[in-house]
UniProtKB/Swiss-Prot annotation:
Keyword entries, A-Z: Coiled coil, Methyltransferase, Nucleus, Ribosome biogenesis, rRNA processing, S-adenosyl-L-methionine, Transferase
Binding site for S-adenosyl-L-methionine: 56, 58, 76, 92, 117
EC number: 2.1.1.-
Gene3D superfamilies to which the protein is assigned, alphabetical: Vaccinia Virus protein VP39 (3.40.50.150)
Official protein name in the record: AdoMet-dependent rRNA methyltransferase spb1
Organism of this sequence: Aspergillus fumigatus (strain ATCC MYA-4609 / CBS 101355 / FGSC A1100 / Af293) (Neosartorya fumigata)
InterPro entries per record: RNA_methyltr_RlmE, RNA_MeTrfase_FtsJ_dom, rRNA-MeTfrase_E, rRNA_MeTfrase_SPB1-like_C, rRNA_MeTfrase_Spb1_DUF3381, SAM-dependent_MTases_sf, SPB1-like
Disordered: annotated span: 367-416, 430-534, 549-613
Residue ranges with Basic and acidic residues bias: 379-390, 460-483, 565-582
Length: 795
């Protein structure tokens, strides 16, 4: 009988023979070829570093696939025979000498790809071999972080073991994409897999713990047991089959009950041990015997102590209460209030306050109140002066040619002010009407009273009308959704930003004298176009960041008012977000345009040069046609904007009246037949479009079809490049794949043939019927109806 030679556990397979035929130094070359076909990183690389490269098969593949004039460096502990276009040297990748040699060869270049296919000398023990290989991978990763370019690729071989997941976690911190794969040329019996890391993040600093094997592969300590959960929630306890504890193989723990009484952590004992024992030791224990004879130690307590693992929350609580009672009897518990029980209570006698002292305190309180009032008024006056000085510096004085010179600096009317009347104490006199008595006839008084009554009646009727109209509007909104949408649009358009509101909150009194000093600012020279340093500091506050430059708001005095209220600052936060961009744009603008009109409208053009205008009404279409044909000019349209309805006074009018008037109080624009037809055609085209869901469904269908075709194309390319298959097998496999992509024929419907006339009692296929068919008759129809009727009755 012939002796069958063993080929090293199947090492001499087809990849071994192909490597011999192709001239590769090892069968591992096909692993890199298959990885490159899947990820395509060699063609994009100009600098490659191969760690643990002996005998050099990966360097051979890299020299074939990479562009010419590429730099390929291979390093290993074992010597590597020379390879064309490859720089090789012998060194240990964990030493500083290897780093210096690589740096010398690369000079100022960075590696686009780093390969690592190394493994330690195996054969001692699988656990030790796996850890050594994981440690070697981490060392190669450390070397790759020094020489890899940002966005580079790192390919390494890893053994599947308990250290695989920590390695993968480290890779994911340093790379954007991490994938583990096993190429077909890798033997199935081998525990090796290849991890392809793409998109190196290139951080400026890497924590040394990331690349320290002691830290990365450290075993996590078990967390402390949660004894409270075992005691107070025993029904929620889940079994964890983690084996036995070290040195404890019986899983039964017993402890004397005296230790449970004396311990400071009874919950830990109840959660850890199985039994609290009352049994006496050979020498005897007096405390244990006393515990057993106590009145509190009932049979229920003894039964609960026999097996702690089967107890519930109620039994655990009774054991804890029993422990407290026993500790009180033995004197182990000291009550908190016991030490202070014998001490006499100190009673503080409060002497009655003297009458003179009470008067002095009242006077002092009134003086402080008056002082605070004066401080508040002084602060307001200083603030008003400071605002006036800033207005003068910014040339924002009130124009004298429109009759507003009588207004005060704060915008108050100087001719009459209620504040001044209140300060003089004459408000009550004016309100009472006793300033001047005028004789009047009794008839005039009667007439005035009648007028007052009629005015009250009119106000009441107006209020009733308003309330009835509101109820009518609410009923319309409940019935019609279009009315609700119209009201929502109206409310949204009516919203306006009211600016900053004054606040009555008082500031701290520590800034009493600061207001007057801050108000003294040197006046700016008349020719200077910039603010003074004080005003610039004032307008650098956060509250003015969203209001633009000073030149843009010269005519808007109210927009410059500084407010001290926190709520107003929150309202202005929406404007503050846009302030940096606007300030940056204005800083880059040339000085020639600083005096331009701030109200100049923005250019409505898009980036492609087309106007951002959509004509949706027949009136607008007719107007556009007139402008396009030259019948009307822009000045004519501006003139048409001034009509009898432009300045219609609507102040004080009720809402129901305005809603009715707005239907008719507007100019009637002429509409041409061509404009109406154009708008109708436009709406027809819009309505002809499918709805959004249908368009999305069609888009998804097209996208999935394209994805399937791309997938089939890649599979067919892989089959075409497979050297192990013959041409016939390749063509059959590709044809089979492409047949799946062909659109399936619609399912043929079953044709119903009524069994009457020539088809009554027929046994075969009816004449003239092709495809699937089913013969039906009136009896079958009645039976189906009866079945449906019975099923409905059962419900």
């Amino acid at each position: 009988m012939a002796i069958q030679k063993k080929h090293g556990k199947g090492r001499l397979d087809k990849w071994y023979r192909l490597a011999k035929e192709k001239g590769y130094r090892a069968r591992a070359a096909f692993k890199l070829i298959q990885l490159n076909k899947k990820y395509g990183f060699l063609e994009k690389s100009k600098v490659l570093l191969d760690l643990c490269a002996a005998p050099g098969s990966w360097c051979q593949v890299a020299a074939e696939c990479m562009p010419t004039q590429s730099i390929i460096i291979g390093v290993d502990l074992a010597p590597i025979k020379p390879i064309p276009r490859v720089i090789t040297f012998q060194s240990d990748i964990t030493t500083e000498k290897c780093r210096a040699t690589i740096r010398q060869h690369l000079k100022h270049w960075k590696a686009d790809t780093v390969l690592h296919d190394g493994a330690p000398n195996v054969g001692t023990a699988w656990v030790q071999d796996a850890f050594s290989q994981a440690e070697l991978v981490l060392q190669s990763m450390k070397l790759a972080t020094e020489f890899l370019v940002e966005g580079g690729t790192f390919v390494t071989k890893v053994f599947r073991s308990k250290d695989y997941n920590p390695l993968l976690w480290v890779f994911k911190q340093l790379f954007t994409s991490v994938e583990a794969t096993k190429p077909p040329s890798s033997r199935n019996v081998s525990a090796e897999i290849f991890v392809v890391c793409r998109g190196f993040k290139a951080p400026k600093r890497i924590d040394p713990k990331f690349l320290d094997p002691k830290h990365v592969f450290a075993e996590l300590t078990d967390s402390t047991p949660n004894n409270e959960a075992r005691v107070f929630n025993p029904e929620k306890k889940k079994r964890k089959r983690e084996g036995y504890e070290e040195g404890d193989y019986t899983q039964f723990k017993e402890i004397p009950v005296t230790e449970f009484i004396n311990t400071t952590d009874p919950i830990a004992i109840l959660g850890t041990y199985n039994k609290l024992s009352f049994e006496q030791s050979p020498g005897g224990d007096l405390a244990l015997a006393t515990l057993n004879r106590l009145e509190e130690t009932t049979d229920e307590i003894r039964t609960c102590c026999e097996d702690l693992k089967i107890l519930g929350k109620k039994e655990f609580r009774s054991l804890l209460r029993w422990r407290l009672k026993v500790r009180e009897k033995f004197g182990l518990v000291v009550k908190k209030g016991q030490a202070k029980a014998d001490e006499p209570e100190e009673v503080a006698e409060v002497a009655p306050m003297d009458e003179e002292l009470a008067i002095q305190e009242e006077l002092q309180r009134l003086q402080e109140k008056e002082s605070a009032k004066r401080k508040k008024e002084r602060r307001k006056e200083n603030e008003k002066k400071r605002k006036e000085i800033i207005r003068m510096q910014m040339h924002m004085t009130t124009p004298m040619d429109i009759g507003m010179e009588q207004l005060g600096p704060g915008g108050d009317d100087a001719t009459f002010s209620l504040k001044r009347v209140e300060r003089d104490g004459a408000r009550d006199v004016i309100a009472s009407g006793k300033l001047a008595e005028i004789e009047s006839d009794s008839e005039d008084d009667q007439t005035e009273s009648d007028y007052d009554e009629s005015d009250d009646e009119g106000d009441r009727l107006e209020r009733e009308l308003d309330s009835l109209y509101e109820q009518y509007q609410e009923r319309r909104e409940d019935r019609d959704s279009k009315v609700r949408a119209k009201k929502a649009r109206k409310d949204y358009e009516a919203e306006e930003w009211d600016g900053f509101s004054d606040s009555d909150k008082e500031d701290d009194e520590e800034s009493e004298e600061d207001g007057a000093s801050q108000a003294v600012v040197k006046p700016a020279p008349p020719n200077s176009g910039t603010l003074s340093s004080k005003a610039a500091m004032f307008f650098d506050q956060d509250i003015f960041q969203g209001l633009g430059d000073v030149d843009d708001v010269e005519d808007e005095d109210s927009a410059i008012e500084m407010q001290e209220d926190d709520k107003s600052a929150k309202k202005g936060s929406a404007l503050e977000k846009k302030a940096p961009k606007e300030a940056k744009k204005k800083a880059q603008a040339p000085e020639d345009f600083s005096d331009s009109d701030p109200e100049e409208p923005d250019d409505p053009r898009k980036k492609n040069g087309q106007l951002d205008i959509d004509i949706i009404t027949a009136e607008a279409m007719a107007l556009a046609q007139q402008m396009a044909t030259g019948e009307k000019k822009s000045q004519d349209i501006i003139d048409d904007g001034f009509n009898r309805y432009t300045f219609r006074d609507v102040d004080g009018l009720p809402e129901w009246f305005l809603d009715d008037e707005n239907k008719h109080s507007k100019p009637q624009r002429p509409i041409t037949k061509a404009a109406a037809a154009a708008i109708k055609e436009k709406l027809r085209a819009i309505n002809a479009r499918p709805i959004k869901k249908v368009m999305e469904a069609k888009g998804r269908k097209k996208m999935k079809a394209a994805q399937r075709l791309e997938k089939l194309r890649k599979k067919s390319a892989l089959l075409a490049d497979d050297e192990a298959l013959s041409e016939r097998d390749k063509s059959q496999a590709i044809a089979k794949l492409m047949s799946k992509a062909v659109k399936k024929k619609p399912k043929q419907q079953v044709k119903l043939v009524v069994a009457r006339g020539a088809n009554r009692g027929i046994s075969g296929r009816p004449r003239g019927v092709k495809g699937k068919y089913k013969i039906v008759d009136s009896r079958m129809k009645k039976d189906i109806r009866a079945q449906k009727r019975l099923a409905k009755k059962k419900k």
